[in-house]
Amino acid sequence: MKKELTIRFFILYIDSLNLKYQAMKPLKKEDLDQEVFDLYDDYAHSRIERREFVNRLSKFAVGGLTVAAIMGFLMPNYAKTSLFSEADPRLVEETITYDSPKGAGMMKALLVRPKNASGKLPGIVVVHENRGLNPYVEDTARQAALDGFIALAPDALSPMGGYPGTDDEGRTMQGKRDKEEMLQDFIAGFETLKSHEQCTGKVGVVGFCFGGWISNMMAVRVPDLSAAVPFYGSQPTAEETAAIKAPLLLHFAGLDTRVNAGWPDYEEALKANDKTYTAYMYPEVNHGFHNHSTPRYDEAAAKLAWGRTIDFFKEKLT
């Protein structure tokens, strides 16, 4: 009897050590079921409320793993993932304002270019996700500048005071704005960049998530847009697709069933209207794979997609 109790105690002790180890061990995305990332996608796109998100995550809080730990892991960490500083000596950047008469009125945007540039540069409008101009998208604009372009990254939250500092707040704020009005804000940003004294007048657009939809719609609405690169963006209708003049480079995430569901009809419309496009599907990666601030980031796919994007812009804008 005494021996059995000793064995049971030893087993419980080992189990407690395992739980502590699991709690202390750094969480990796490979540790989480794909359903966790799907739930985060639903939450990040306002298809479920925070309470439901937390409740549904609870089934994955096992073996010393807590809901709080999972949520903390899924959320963006800009303090640890920022790629550039505002004082990067290779760049010249400023916050500008421009008028959006068909949109919100006065808009703010980050304007950035390479410091060592000689002469005018082709331009890229960089369009954020559904939560305002956060540090990830600012980093993307800076990277575009280092790659040889003058980049403009507008903030759709400008009429509400700008990006509030957290993505949750930004998403709530952006959800209160009208999509058509925001589209007009980015079209006005295109016109501002096109006429900038340091721009050649050849301008393309790249956008992510909501920004992918904006990129698709700018291709529909802006006849003199030189190129459009939507990353996992919702698609225009077949009727709207007929108006596209700009060449398209489209990036899709293999696990992104929500956005990918609209791709077959979009591709059919592109083919039917003899549009110029190239599309890439990146297998086994999630929506948001280019965003380096969250665990959905996939380094290999992100670098490949961005390299293709820059090559495309250099071909179409220069």
Where are these regions (language model features)?
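N-terminal secretory signal peptides
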Residues: 5, 9-52
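Short beta-strand element of the alpha/beta-hydrolase
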Residues: 120-129
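Alpha/beta-hydrolase active-site loop
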Residues: 173-196
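Short beta-strand/loop motif that positions the catalytic acidic residue
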Residues: 250-252
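N-terminal export signals
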Residues: 50-76
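N-terminal cap/lid segment of alpha/beta-hydrolase-fold proteins
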Residues: 81-118
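Alpha/beta-hydrolase fold nucleophile elbow
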Residues: 197-208
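Cap/lid segment of the alpha/beta-hydrolase catalytic domain
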Residues: 131, 157-180, 288-293
